[in-house]
Regions:
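Conserved catalytic cores of very large enzyme subunits
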Residues: 1-308, 313-542
Length: 542
């Protein structure tokens, strides 16, 4: 700016003015992140401390004032499904703490620890606070973040610095820009200050496989919405079924991208963002608006939803119908049409006796890899309207509840209208071999080919209690990140507390849970979303 901040306080104030400007311009909804807030503030912090005009108490107080500002930021008006499921989440401002510096050194500093203390003191659902953990991150910093997480209010989330950087580099970003980047919104990765990345909406992958089994006919709406590629009972081999699934995937991705491109063109022509363009690299030199392709990088993301559910569905069909011939496709379809009522034998086979993603089972996990690659290859590299390209990420926000509501019974034994799996997490109750098996299954996905993946884990408080529990939690994070996992977050709360909070919300007004890439008060969630959180598997290290 023309008048640069001279003090720590002024630097915080400048950020808040900038944040207000861009969010107000966009009414106020786009998940803007302040970037590496700890690294941006650190030079001012050191200067003021050395000058004797700032101590840690005052520095923390100013951060907490900023947190209050974030919390009071008016959220966009919710409508439709979003209003019903989670009407109170705010504007997804995401504070990244830790990571590395633009030249690759450890980025943790004194302000990083002050931000952790601020999170712990304030315990607000907004801003969305996370820590980025690199191989160079001190153990003390990770353990302090784990201490806060195990207190049971859903923050901070944990991100893999090296994975974030490689995701951006693999997408064509310069290394220095990638190191300055990180995660905003839910879990998506961007090159802050240089990239206009837009989340274009969600793709219901289990629904596409369901339509494949029913020859493009949608049981929910009673309409033919997919391609007619043949009745499932007529497929003689699994390869024939897979070929039909591939064609349906390509068809629905084409429909989605055509719609997205119309919207992007409308934004470019009718929705200029002058303030955002001023603070985004290359918009001025390119003489183009942020929404018209002026930024250095211009990415459009499509979010895949339900990878756990669809993996188990495909695995159940392949294992039981084609490999073991436990029953015919016709028998499975008939059981699904009746919501498995009166078809206990088929239900037991698909729900309890078939390979499941999330257990380090190569049979299921290789199917997950195939589905992921089909999804990735169908989307990644497609041109958008801003001179950039489409890429993928794997996150649901809350739409996994709605996506499940529009699907009747599925081939994995999931009953009609139940939520599908969220993020890259396994289907509820399918992961029976503990958290280590979960992260090993999840790590078989190519995270570095995405713009972000979301993994939820749930522990009861006793599992992460004491020094042993704390060390186990930190080790789980380090192990997952060593296998290129992008993100992991925790709900530390027991099932009975959640059930009681559902029945007696007046007694649990301050209960905060991690939903997807954000936290919210449990009492403010719609009942189906509350049920989904209650039903998540409670993990144990034993």
């Amino acid at each position: 700016p023309a008048h640069r901040p001279q003090t720590y306080w002024q630097a915080i104030q400048l950020y808040w003015f900038t944040h207000l400007a861009v969010t107000t311009e966009l009414n106020p909804w786009d998940a803007f992140s302040p970037g590496r807030l700890d690294q941006h503030l650190y030079p001012y912090y050191r200067k003021d401390v050395e000058a004797g005009i700032l101590d840690d108490r005052k520095a923390l107080e100013l951060l907490e004032c900023l947190w209050v500002k974030f919390y009071n930021q008016p959220a966009p008006v919710k409508v439709g499904i979003t209003l019903k499921e989670s009407a109170t989440y705010t504007d997804f401002a995401n504070i990244n703490t830790g990571g590395v510096t633009p030249d690759g050194r450890n980025g943790v500093n004194e302000v990083s620890y002050l931000i952790l203390d601020c999170m712990d003191d304030m315990r607000l659902v907004q801003p969305n606070s996370n820590v980025t953990i690199s191989k160079k991150t001190p153990a003390r910093f990770l353990k302090r973040a784990c201490e806060i997480s195990r207190e049971g209010w859903g923050q901070p989330a944990f991100y893999n610095t090296e994975a974030q950087i490689m995701e951006l580099v693999n997408a064509g970003k310069m290394l220095a820009d990638a190191r300055r980047g990180g995660s905003s919104g839910c879990v998506e990765t961007g090159a802050w200050g240089s990239e206009a990345y837009i989340l274009t909406g969600y793709l219901n992958i289990p629904k596409i496989f369901q339509l494949t089994l029913f020859n493009g006919y949608d049981q929910y709406s009673g309409k033919q919405i997919g391609l007619k590629l043949g009745e499932a009972k007529d497929f003689k081999t699994f390869d024939e079924l897979w070929a039909a699934f591939k064609k349906q995937m390509e068809y629905f991705v084409d429909v989605k991208i055509r719609g997205n491109n119309v919207i992007e063109k409308l934004y470019a022509e009718n929705m200029p963002a002058p303030c955002l363009s001023v603070v985004t690299n290359d918009c001025i030199s390119n003489a183009k608006d942020y929404n018209a392709g002026g930024a250095r990088y211009n990415t459009s993301y499509i979010q895949g939803v339900g990878i756990g559910t669809v993996t188990d569905c495909v695995a159940a069909v392949k294992y039981n119908v084609f490999d073991k011939k436990n029953f015919t496709m016709e028998e499975l379809i008939e059981a699904m049409e009746h919501n498995f009522e009166g078809y206990d034998a088929v239900y037991h086979m698909v729900h309890d006796k078939s390979p499941k993603y999330g257990n380090d089972d190569d049979y299921a996990d290789e199917i997950m890899q195939d589905i992921f690659e089909l999804y990735r290859s169908t989307i990644t590299g497609r041109p958008n309207m801003r001179g950039g390209e489409y890429r993928i990420d794997m996150l649901p926000t809350t739409c996994h509840v709605y996506f499940g509501d529009v699907i009747l019974a599925t081939a994995n034994g999931r009953k009609a209208h139940k939520p599908v799996s969220e993020g890259i997490s396994p289907e509820k109750s399918a992961d029976t071999h503990g958290p280590t098996a979960v992260i090993k299954s999840c790590s078989k996905m190519d995270h570095l080919a995405t713009g972000g993946t979301l993994l939820n884990q749930k522990f009861t408080p006793d599992v992460v209690a004491g020094e042993t529990g704390l060390n186990n939690m930190a080790s789980l994070i380090r192990s997952y990140f060593a296998m290129d996992g992008h993100h992991i977050q925790f709900n530390v709360v027991d099932r009975q507390t959640l059930i009681d909070a559902q029945k007696h919300p007046e007694d649990h007004k301050d209960l905060i849970v991690r939903v997807a890439g954000y936290s919210d008060f449990f009492r403010n969630l719609d009942k189906p979303l509350q049920d989904e959180i209650i039903e998540r598997t409670e993990q144990s290290f034993s």
